[in-house]
């Protein structure tokens, strides 16, 4: 029990801070990315119980984890489940592999687990060898979900640095040959593009245009000079 206490305390602190953020204007719900790499971590069930006790309505897992998925059954927590980068090639190359992945990691737990999105790859850079597998893997996973009778959206998670220029409303994707076909797929299927946004890093890299209150989530709103909208 003593080995789990520091990690459990850290999770409780994070949960408490995020719960406080729910009081910010315009915030309807909030989720927490659940990383499983580390020492002396609480059990999966303890982590899910913490989410529920702090009214955290969303979770992201960076790869399938049987214990975590089992603990999520009946929790009503919406889940974003990632497909790791090292699995993209096999899933992109073989529709049967995609179908088996969906069977093992999604259909087995649905509808007891509320899958919101399957994120095919996380922060895959356009220059990486894995980049050419992202879209075909997304297509195969989408087809496997449809064949399994599951209405779950498929997307991928990108770095905010994939967009160049400031403000974001005036930005452009820096590798249109990579992202444009993905955007077309997402638009055709009514899926969002997922982006990993780190406000404090944005502030650190561009303090002239980005305010500290924005980075600390204490700003009542941030207006884009391009759109005059928050």
Enumerate the language-model features and the residues they cover.
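Terminal membrane/secretory targeting segments in land-plant proteins
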Residues: 1-33
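Active-site mouth loops of central-metabolism enzymes
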Residues: 28-42, 91-92, 172-173
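Short, acidic/polar
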Residues: 37-51, 95-108, 177-180
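Catalytic domains of carbohydrate-active enzymes, especially glycoside hydrolases
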Residues: 45-67
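Conserved, mostly hydrophobic/aromatic
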Residues: 59, 118, 193
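Substrate-binding cleft of extracellular glycoside hydrolase catalytic domains
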Residues: 68-175
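Noncatalytic carbohydrate-binding groove/subsite architecture in carbohydrate-active enzymes
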Residues: 130-230
């Amino acid at each position: 029990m003593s080995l789990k206490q520091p990690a459990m305390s850290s999770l409780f602190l994070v949960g408490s801070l995020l719960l406080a953020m729910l009081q910010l204007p315009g915030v309807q719900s909030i989720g927490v990315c659940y990383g499983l790499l580390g020492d002396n971590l609480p059990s999966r069930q303890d982590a899910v119980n913490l989410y529920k006790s702090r009214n955290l309505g969303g979770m992201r897992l960076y790869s399938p984890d049987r214990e975590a998925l089992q603990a999520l059954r009946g929790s009503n927590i919406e889940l974003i489940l990632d497909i790791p980068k090292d699995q993209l090639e096999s899933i992109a190359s073989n529709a049967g592999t995609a179908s088996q992945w969906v069977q093992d990691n999604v259909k087995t737990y649905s509808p007891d687990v509320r899958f919101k999105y399957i994120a095919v790859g996380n922060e895959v850079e356009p220059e990486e060898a894995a980049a050419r597998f992202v879209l075909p893997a997304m297509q195969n996973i989408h087809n496997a979900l449809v064949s399994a009778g599951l209405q779950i959206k498929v997307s991928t998670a990108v770095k905010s640095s994939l967009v160049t220029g400031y403000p974001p409303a005036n930005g452009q994707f820096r590798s249109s040959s990579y992202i444009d076909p993905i955007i077309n797929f997402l638009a055709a299927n009514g899926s969002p593009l997922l982006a990993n946004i780190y406000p404090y890093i944005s502030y650190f890299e561009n303090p002239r245009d980005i305010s500290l209150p924005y980075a600390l989530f204490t700003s009542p709103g941030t207006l884009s000079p391009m759109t005059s909208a928050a």
